[in-house]
């Protein structure tokens, strides 16, 4: 499976075309809109979320709530477009109109794509860069992830994302009993954190950063349960599932690091403290006594829960902007200010969940069948049976 997205932050709409979804999958616009609404929540979001109420429209690839096997097209309208029709319109304008155009940007923001993208594409108005590099694009990535989650749900595979850290505040309580328990608590949390006390401290940290004109980052975790053994490959580097998951997480705006299981803690431990002992269970077959490697060994799933974390840097748009240089005058100035969040970590956990779900669904569909969801279900069950009886 694959998908492409198109659209600018303040353009008329965002679009994604999803190819390779098996036929027969039940999905509705409401399934997708549920995930889009989750992305828009979270303490620390900016005024844009008060304007937009994202709703996806399926324009092809689905008939009577069942996928056809042909490409699925989804569009999400930008309600703020009415204020940007002149500035972001596709119609030609005169040089005089261009010179008088408001909101042209010549002062790049440190930490953003502005300057590098402007040099790459020779844009004198860096709005041409920031409109596409904006995290607004993650709206349709979450829409694609919603389709992937429907595939996984058919196969008994569950996915959940949550927040472990915002700023210096870390969640201490993570003793959830199941993915359902984790979701039940985090869906009610303004910062998507299982630890309620840590969640209150996280909100205070976000408020403090906002009051100071600053931004704040954090760490999110995604857990996948119900995976069959052997998804992925050890044969080639580009078929290892952990490499694909790492790329997916790092492709999210502002994410700068990724780890699995105990992750970077492994550097300070002996091998006996890192690797998971193999045990036999009459019901489950081969399993592990621990899950320090996060459900992945040799680029393949072990059947244990996949545990992947990503670190998100603070958003680079600051209301107390850093120093920069005007590309027209070459004089020092403070960077441009765009409407932005002070913290997007809670929303980013939903985006990370979607990104991980997509890669998992893609790997499962590729390995167990491409065309029909019922055939894939049968093949997955056969693989689980083989694993138990091996």
Curated annotation (Swiss-Prot):
InterPro entries: Chorismate_synth, Chorismate_synth_AroC_sf, Chorismate_synthase_CS
Cofactor: FMNH2
GO cellular component: cytosol
Bound cofactor: record note: Reduced FMN (FMNH(2)).
Keywords per UniProt: Amino-acid biosynthesis, Aromatic amino acid biosynthesis, FAD, Flavoprotein, FMN, Lyase, NADP
Gene3D superfamilies (alphabetical): Chorismate synthase AroC
Binding site residues for NADP(+): 39, 45
EC number(s) recorded for this UniProt protein: 4.2.3.5
GO terms for MF: chorismate synthase activity; FMN binding
Keyword Amino-acid biosynthesis: yes
Catalytic activity annotation: 5-O-(1-carboxyvinyl)-3-phosphoshikimate = chorismate + phosphate
Binding-site residues, FMN: 132-134, 253-254, 298, 313-317, 339
Entries under CDD domains matching the protein: Chorismate_synthase
Pathway given in the UniProt record: Metabolic intermediate biosynthesis; chorismate biosynthesis; chorismate from D-erythrose 4-phosphate and phosphoenolpyruvate: step 7/7
A biological-process GO annotation: chorismate biosynthetic process
Assembly, per entry: Homotetramer.
Described function: This reaction introduces a second double bond into the aromatic ring system.
Family affiliation: Belongs to the chorismate synthase family.
Protein name per the record: Chorismate synthase
UniProt organism field: Bacillus velezensis (strain DSM 23117 / BGSC 10A6 / LMG 26770 / FZB42)
């Amino acid at each position: 499976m694959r998908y492409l997205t198109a659209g600018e932050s303040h353009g008329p709409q965002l679009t994604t075309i999803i190819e390779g979804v098996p036929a027969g999958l039940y999905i509705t616009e409401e399934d997708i809109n549920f995930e889009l609404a989750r992305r828009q929540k979270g303490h620390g979001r900016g005024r844009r979320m008060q304007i937009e109420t994202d709703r996806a429209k399926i324009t092809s690839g689905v008939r009577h709530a069942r996928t056809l096997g042909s490409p699925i097209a989804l569009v999400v309208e930008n309600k703020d477009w009415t204020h940007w029709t002149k500035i972001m319109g596709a119609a030609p304008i005169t040089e005089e109109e261009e010179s008088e155009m408001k909101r042209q940007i010549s002062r790049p923001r440190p930490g953003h794509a502005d300057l590098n993208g402007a040099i790459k594409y020779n844009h004198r108005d860096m709005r041409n860069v920031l409109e596409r590099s904006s995290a607004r694009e993650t709206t349709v990535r979450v829409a694609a992830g919603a389709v992937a989650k429907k595939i996984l749900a058919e196969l008994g595979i569950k996915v959940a994302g949550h927040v472990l850290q915002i700023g210096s505040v870390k969640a201490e309580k993570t003793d959830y009993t199941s993915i359902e328990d984790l979701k039940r608590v985090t869906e009610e949390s303004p910062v998507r954190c299982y630890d309620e006390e840590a969640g209150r401290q996280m909100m205070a940290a976000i408020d403090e950063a906002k009051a100071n004109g600053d931004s704040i980052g954090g760490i999110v975790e995604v857990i996948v349960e119900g995976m069959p053994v052997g998804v992925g490959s050890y044969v080639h580097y580009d078929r290892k599932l952990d490499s694909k998951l790492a790329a997916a997480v790092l492709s999210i705006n502002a994410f700068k690091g990724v780890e699995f299981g105990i992750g970077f803690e492994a550097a300070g431990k002996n091998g006996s403290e890192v690797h998971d002992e193999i045990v036999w269970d009459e019901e489950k077959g081969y399993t592990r006594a621990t899950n320090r490697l996060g459900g992945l060994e040799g680029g393949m799933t072990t059947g244990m829960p996949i545990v992947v974390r990503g670190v998100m840097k603070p958003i680079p748009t600051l209301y107390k902007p850093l120093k920069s240089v005007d590309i027209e005058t070459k004089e020092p100035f403070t960077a441009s200010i765009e409407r932005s969040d002070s913290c997007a970590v809670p929303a980013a956990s939903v985006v990370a969940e979607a990104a991980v779900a997509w890669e998992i669904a893609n790997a499962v569909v590729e390995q167990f069948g491409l065309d029909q969801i019922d055939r894939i279900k049968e093949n997955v069950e056969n693989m689980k049976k083989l694993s138990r009886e091996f």
